[in-house]
């Protein structure tokens, strides 16, 4: 019978390890050395800021720090201290980074804090450099611009499930004294607005769960390559005061910064940094289903197409059944100037001008020609009304929906003439 086991000797182990050390080829590092020319990628302003006169010579080069961070992301090590331990036991990685001696973790942290803005400019420069490469890979997909928001969860105690369980116990204690208090809904109001150790980590509802995170916008192309990341921090809110925060006691409706509210400021900053970039197709979710956003995408950011699903909440349709006595309103036609006509005798509707409520798109309001002012409202005097409303039939026209027919001014009106 064949022996399935073999005797392992210390000599064989030593021989195998020695052979592996002598024969291994770090091909990945060789590829990086061959194709990664950091001197041509790092902006000149970054060099000047790093090597400016400080009273003593730099022990570590700028390229060494950049290589350290790139290698850290390639390997997938989150903590700087763990990455330094890895370098301490691997000569090849130290040689790749160019460290004659290893810096401590505090030195790495100070570098990121002191040169945060320059690191951002470095990545912005990479976007400009990689854009032609993306176009060469797939011209069609590289011409897509995809926008979405996310939350970067911070490793704070408030994100630990134990923290929530403690607050839930407090809520249940309140429920014992007040039976009308719902502990599972009320616990949300007991949670602090920000994390104790990091005020940038705010309590918000993201991706179906609550957490303490820094909300951010991510812009990618159709290839999935990131083009821009914008944190919704205090600096961003100060630059764009139109971004309003909201905080409620209900996690189902709480939104720190809405997706549609953040779209215009983020895209404005993106194209300001990259004025030579242009895209024809915008892709986003149904939260961008707004006529104001369609107008901004087309005329401010010069998109030719906007792929945004219709939001059912923005499309109110009157539902009837066979047993309902309510009839479906007759369709309304329009004249050559875009004025709606009465479905019974083609009489032009009466224009009441522009109508724009809070957080609503600009629209033109038309009312039934037989609707008369009566006190605080209007009263329909039609003998055969086409609606059950005592106000009379109303038609709203969104100019951005058909910019050719409604170019900001109603055709055929006194203002047009």
Predicted features by range, described:
Residues 1-46, 388:
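Charged, often Cys/His-bearing segments associated with DNA-binding zinc-finger transcription factors
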Residues 2-4, 300, 307-309, 317-417:
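An anionic, glycine-rich sequence signature occurring as long contiguous blocks
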Residues 79, 104-108, 122:
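Short coil turns linking two alpha-helices in DNA-binding domains
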Residues 80-96:
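DNA-recognition alpha helix
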Residues 81, 85, 106, 280:
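Residues within the helices of the helix-turn-helix
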Residues 97-116:
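Major-groove recognition helix of helix-turn-helix-like DNA-binding domains
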Residues 114-286, 291-299, 311:
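Polybasic low-complexity intrinsically disordered regions
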């Amino acid at each position: 019978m064949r022996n399935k086991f073999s005797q392992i000797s210390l000599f064989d182990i030593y021989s195998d390890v020695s052979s592996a050390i002598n024969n291994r080829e770090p091909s990945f590092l060789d590829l990086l050395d061959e194709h990664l020319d950091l001197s041509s990628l790092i902006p000149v302003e970054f060099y000047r800021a790093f090597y400016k006169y400080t009273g003593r010579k730099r022990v570590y080069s700028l390229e060494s720090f950049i290589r350290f961070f790139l290698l850290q992301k390639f390997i997938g090590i989150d903590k700087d201290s763990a990455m330094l331990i890895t370098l301490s036991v691997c000569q090849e990685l130290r040689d790749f980074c160019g460290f004659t001696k290893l810096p401590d973790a505090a030195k790495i942290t100070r570098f990121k804090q002191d040169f945060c803005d320059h690191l951002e400019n470095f990545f912005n420069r990479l976007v400009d450099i990689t854009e032609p490469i993306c176009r060469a890979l797939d011209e069609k997909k590289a011409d897509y611009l995809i926008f979405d928001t996310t939350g970067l969860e911070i490793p704070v105690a408030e994100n630990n499930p134990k923290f929530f369980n403690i607050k839930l116990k407090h809520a249940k204690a309140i429920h014992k004294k007040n039976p009308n208090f719902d502990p599972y809904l009320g616990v949300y109001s007991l949670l602090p607005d920000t994390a104790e150790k990091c005020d940038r980590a705010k309590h918000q509802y993201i991706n179906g769960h609550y957490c303490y995170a820094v909300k951010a916008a991510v812009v990618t192309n159709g290839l999935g390559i990131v083009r821009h990341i914008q944190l919704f921090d205090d600096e961003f809110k100060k630059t764009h005061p139109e971004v309003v925060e909201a905080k409620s006691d209900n996690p189902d409706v709480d939104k720190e910064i809405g997706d549609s509210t953040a779209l215009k400021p983020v895209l404005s900053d993106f194209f300001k940094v990259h004025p030579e970039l242009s895209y024809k197709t915008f892709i986003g979710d149904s939260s961008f289903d707004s006529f104001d956003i369609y107008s901004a995408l087309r005329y401010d950011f010069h998109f030719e197409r906007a792929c945004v699903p219709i939001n059912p909440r923005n499309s109110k349709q009157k539902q009837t059944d066979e047993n309902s006595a309510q009839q479906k309103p007759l369709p309304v036609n329009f004249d050559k100037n875009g004025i709606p006509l009465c479905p019974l005798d083609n009489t032009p509707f009466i224009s009441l001008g522009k109508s724009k409520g809070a957080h609503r798109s600009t629209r033109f309001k038309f009312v039934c020609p037989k609707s008369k002012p009566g006190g605080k409202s209007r009263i329909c005097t039609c003998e055969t009304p086409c609606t059950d409303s005592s106000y009379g039939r109303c038609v709203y026209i969104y100019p951005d929906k058909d910019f050719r027919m409604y170019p900001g001014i109603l055709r055929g009106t006194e203002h047009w003439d």
